[in-house]
Amino acid sequence: MTEYTPMIKQYLEIKDKYQDAFLFFRLGDFYEMFFEDALNASQILEITLTGREGGTKEKIPMCGVPYHSASGYIDTLIEKGYKVAICEQVEDPKTTKGMVKREVVQLISPGTVMDERGLKAKENNYIASLYCYEGKEYGFAYSDLSTGELKSTVIEASEDRLINELTTLSTRELIVSSSEKEVLSDVMKEQLGLTFSVHEEDTIPVENEKLVTRHMSLSEKRAIGKLLHYLKETQKRDLGHLQQAVHYETSNYMKMDYYSKRNLELAESIRGKGRQGTLLWLLDNTQTAMGGRMLKQWIDRPLIDRKKIIDRQNDVSELMAHFFERLELVENLKNVYDLERLAGRVAYGNVNARDLIQLRNSLYQIPRIRATLLSMSSESLTELANQLDPCEELTEKLEEAIMDSAPISIREGGIIKDGYNSQLDTYRDASRNGKTWIAELERKERELTGIKTMKVGFNRVFGYYIEVTRANTHLLPEGRYERKQTLTNAERYITPELKEKEKLILDAEEKSMELEYQLFSEVREMVKDYIERLQKLAKSVSEIDCLQSFADISEKNHFIRPTLSEDGSLHVKQGRHPVVEKVMGAQSYVANDCVLDENREILLITGPNMSGKSTYMRQVALTAICAQVGCFVPAEEAILPIFDQIFTRIGAADDLIAGQSTFMVEMLEARNAIVHATKDSLILFDEIGRGTATYDGMALAQAIIEYIHENVHAKTLFSTHYHELTDLEKELSGLQNIHVSAVEENGKVVFLHKIKEGPADKSYGIHVAELAELPKSLIERASRILEQLENDDKKIIIASVKQPEEVHEEVQLSMFPVEPEKKASSKETKLLKEIASMNIMQMTPMDAMNKLYELQSKIH
């Protein structure tokens, strides 16, 4: 058996308890990693792998990072989904005989990050837990440890429902029992890209019982208990900033599944995976980090409560009507710090003096914000204003105690104001007077010795000294100057008087810094008493920030206040896609009407590719979402129903990880909509059935339309290239044909992007290919084939080098005819390769439009 050294034994004993984490093992000024941790970390962090003697024949793999710069390395590991266990020395090496005791003081995981550098200001960092009750329901709880938010609910024991909750929250980590983890599919684990943590204990810790209310179900309490136990065991510190668990019902909000949110690009773009080009990007003019986080929550969960929607609309109207007051509000909000996350750091003991200065400056703004809101006539804004707690006693205490110029470090003094503590003032006076005496000493010694270059200095190693150049040492009186340090060109001395004063000064400074740290710690502890009040204040300020953002964006983009219909009808005049309009510019964008009511439940949309069908469908959904989050909408007039759910199938979001084809995903999403939609839902289906054979696809598309019409009665926009389906208008009373218009000018197609009544009369597919600059010979051949297909009952035409009139009917399409007179140029070939490499199925209409402009610019 291998006999390791005592230190390696200690490492292995601790590592055994944290098998799923990198163990940062403190040795002096470094965090060291050994064995497999070292091998993996050296590659991930790109740091040098070395070895250390550990009692074995060969050196043990080792790598390390300096403790003072470890946070950057920790952030890298966390961002990649790993966990890091911080193991510190918990005994003083100077007073300990033998091996210094070490313990893990914190486990940092993707869901438990508290360091500001590892968090995104306008994004929550959620950790969730799951409790499966008899296979029937899931108790579900989640928290943002950095803000103290804690919420819970009960959902159906369905993987789809669970995925919807997890993706809505952008959850970073999920806590499950070992048996629950086994039940969840591997596909789900890979798709979600979150960290799974196994934890069995699920009873509420005694000290946290006050966070749970009695009316919560057993499964909900168990989910909360599992979450709290995990946080308690991994954080190993006070979690007093966690708020009382708030129960929420998913039925109180508009439901959208993961694919619908992705297709509509609410908070993340399909192509760039960022905020740019999303609805959140457009609507976000929040001035505070916490306001930005609340705005995302609002967009993720639109309201279905009519009164709450109207209240928000009233607030936005009021803010729009008071332009100058709104400007003043914005200026005040700019100076409000992230109160939510500050409260979390106070609980953790991580705040510094600068944080407290920012807290004080934030609290200064609250009376001003309150006064501005009270000057308006909105009842709900008045209610919000009255909820603003300026925490006057805290503001006064911070004003009295903390210097405006306080440093970040809390151990080096310069934090507490003069006059705050009499003993501190005494120490400071002693230090200042001593330094004045030393400055005077330098003048006296120069006069006494006649050495004009003599100076009195100080360093941390030797303390105070008198420095004389070598050339002048002979001028010093004998017996009074004691040599302290020899330099290349000078000698440093000390005198009895200087030695005595040095002790007084250094003692005073040491005591001053010790007392100052103690006083700062007392102030920091005092702030803990205000955590709950600060969290409530943060919530009110965040809501105000979101409302002013809606007002600002609505005004700048010419949005109007929508009316909520009572009969479920939708009437939008000159509606626009808010994001596309922003990117293209209002002058370039073509607005369109949309009407859906009991006589027009289904709009069947035909028209060529690139004409704007998908954009039109998306704009209807985004208009509804804007209305139900309480914002104004991009239109000239709008009467909108309150939708309980939105389902979309737009574009080809192939589920490659699950091994499902485009068509299978299409059918699964269609089923999801058909089974769960109600008469109050909105369904957007873009070219359903295109992933299979023509007649199969057409048959399925027709059957789906008929089923929605006869059984579901949801408001539906259904785009298709199956022109035959337009005949359904004669059979289905609630279906209306509309099309995106286009015209031919000089043999070229011009897309008007205008929605008109009735079916499209032509496809223009070949014209789209021509716009993409496909070779001329290819376009001409396609035109001849199309002409024959249209004239010959759509039979397949064999390729031939003969003229069209000499071609006979065949059932197999062969090679294109050879046209020696015209070969593709190198420029055409290059463009063809670029077009061929494009992943069209992953492009949004806006992406495709931008790419087309880019290709055109290369030609011209």
From Swiss-Prot:
InterPro entries: DNA_mismatch_repair_MutS, DNA_mismatch_repair_MutS-lik_N, DNA_mismatch_repair_MutS/MSH, DNA_mismatch_repair_MutS_C, DNA_mismatch_repair_MutS_clamp, DNA_mismatch_repair_MutS_core, DNA_mismatch_repair_MutS_N, DNA_mismatch_repair_MutS_sf
Record-level Gene Ontology MF annotations: ATP binding; ATP-dependent DNA damage sensor activity; damaged DNA binding; mismatched DNA binding
UniProt record similarity statement: Belongs to the DNA mismatch repair MutS family.
CDD domains: ABC_MutS1
Gene Ontology CC annotations of this record: cytosol
NCBIfam families: mutS1 (TIGR01070), PRK05399.1 (NF003810)
Species name: Listeria monocytogenes serotype 4b (strain CLIP80459)
Protein name as catalogued: DNA mismatch repair protein MutS
Function: This protein is involved in the repair of mismatches in DNA. It is possible that it carries out the mismatch recognition step. This protein has a weak ATPase activity.
Gene3D superfamilies named among the record's database cross-references: 1.10.1420.10, DNA repair protein MutS, domain I (3.40.1170.10), MutS, connector domain (3.30.420.110), P-loop containing nucleotide triphosphate hydrolases (3.40.50.300)
